[in-house]
Swiss-Prot record:
Highest taxon in the source lineage: Bacteria
Family: Belongs to the TRAFAC class translation factor GTPase superfamily. Classic translation factor GTPase family. PrfC subfamily.
NCBIfam families membership: prfC, PRK00741.1, small_GTP
GO-annotated molecular function: GTP binding; GTPase activity; translation release factor activity, codon nonspecific; translation release factor activity, codon specific
Any one of the GO BP annotations: regulation of translational termination
Gene3D superfamilies: P-loop containing nucleotide triphosphate hydrolases, Peptide chain release factor 3, domain III, Translation factors
Domain tr-type G: start-end pairs: 8-277
UniProt xrefs under Pfam families: EF-G_D2, GTP_EFTU, RF3_C
Protein name per Swiss-Prot or TrEMBL: Peptide chain release factor 3
Location(s) in or outside the cell: Cytoplasm
InterPro entries in the record: EF-G-like_DII, EFG_III/V, G_TR_CS, P-loop_NTPase, PrfC, RF3_C, RF3_dom_3_sf, RF3_GTP-bd
GO cellular component, one term: cytosol
Amino acid sequence: MNLKEEIESRKTFAIISHPDAGKTTLTEKLLYFSGAIREAGTVKGKKTGKFATSDWMKVEQERGISVTSSVMQFDYDDYKINILDTPGHEDFSEDTYRTLMAVDSAVMVIDCAKGIEPQTLKLFKVCKMRGIPIFTFINKLDRVGKEPFELLDEIEETLNIDTYPMNWPVGMGQNFFGIIDRHSKTIEPFRDEENLLHLNEDYELKEEHAIKNDSAFEQAIEEMMLVDEAGEAFDNEALLNGELTPVFFGSALANFGVQNFLNAYVDHAPMPNARQTKEEVDVSPFDTDFSGFIFKIQANMDPKHRDRIAFMRVVSGAFERGMDVTLQRTNKKQKITRSTSFMADDKETVNHAVAGDIIGLYDTGNYQIGDTLVGGKQKYSFQELPQFTPEIFMKVSAKNVMKQKHFHKGIEQLVQEGAIQYYKTLHTNQIILGAVGQLQFEVFEHRMNNEYNVDVVMEPVGRKIARWIENEEDIKDNMNTSRSILVKDRYDNYVFLFENEFATRWFEEKFSDIKLYSLL
């Protein structure tokens, strides 16, 4: 297989959903159908103690949510698929956003009983903003939920995107019989003991079966004919432009509808995309020179070795272990000899990767999120990854003053991997941490204790709004007020932390020559 064929075989996507919609379950079942894992067990193992493949961090195992982004690669048919299992909690939008910068498509998982939920909407907007094609898997059809047309209408109205159902459910909950495949005109029964049923062009059963006289079957056929009469053909270009989402019904927990989805996904999902540089030049995946960017850094994936891994998306060409690359931020050459792939906490050495692949680079502190690595004589850097403005701030210190070394090492590593944002007061050097949501602080506290053996003391600062300053040279000492704190971020930029919107507006009126701005 030549380089062009290798790149065309890559499919890289993220799975997005609201917590408990079945995202991690779907991830596991995709791995199961690909043969990447031997057993697809129940993911939600709070009683059994059995944990999902993609939830490897201890706090994830304890709480049953994904709070980091795992990367899994597997072969299916003639394709090599990279799945990024995004954080499944609403507090982790910043890490999720960075993950979505590294994919070419997304799979949106929706609970049929709940429809579009807040986190789903938030993540969808990020995908829409980036023009990422979205596939929809409506999950838990073996439970009672909303009617199919109601769910499609909700997706179209709430998300402002057209839908195209690729299959259609027959019944729901206890009366769930199976799904009708629109393309093959077949009915796949939910129960294993049933055989595949076939329909003619008029949706009449070719075989004799008791379901023929069932009201749920009759309703499903009527609905399917209504969908067909709408006359809208599947438009792959609209999918690739982010204007249409193909919709699949199924039950991930029951292994039902997942393989049908996977088959359709590899047929219709985009191959690796070009990526824009800071100079607004598109770098094609087929460029022969290697390039890639770091979108995530994760410390202590293996607690025994206290390792640190930088997650890199290969943008163009081919990566070969041992190759020389240039880290553009420092303009220094380096030889990459330690590279790894992932299956959650299982890792193996990567000798070769091409555009679209996600690989891990062992990091001794060289890399930062957003770094560009290039081979050959290329000089460009990719556009920076956006940063979110925190909404919660805490003073933090070590409970035991004898643990200062471990305390500062832990904070440095967790800040570098993007788990938390770092600020420091100007005169007292008090460390203040910022987060998008409360759970980030809980995870930070847990990891400091579990990975660095440091108990931390955290105290709310009473500030909710962070604003950066465009004209830093105009800052004066008298600008600190009882309702604001002047701090520096990890890059030494000045930042004002304000108590509330009123305090922000008061400052802007009093010091009108100071130009404030926020991040995303």
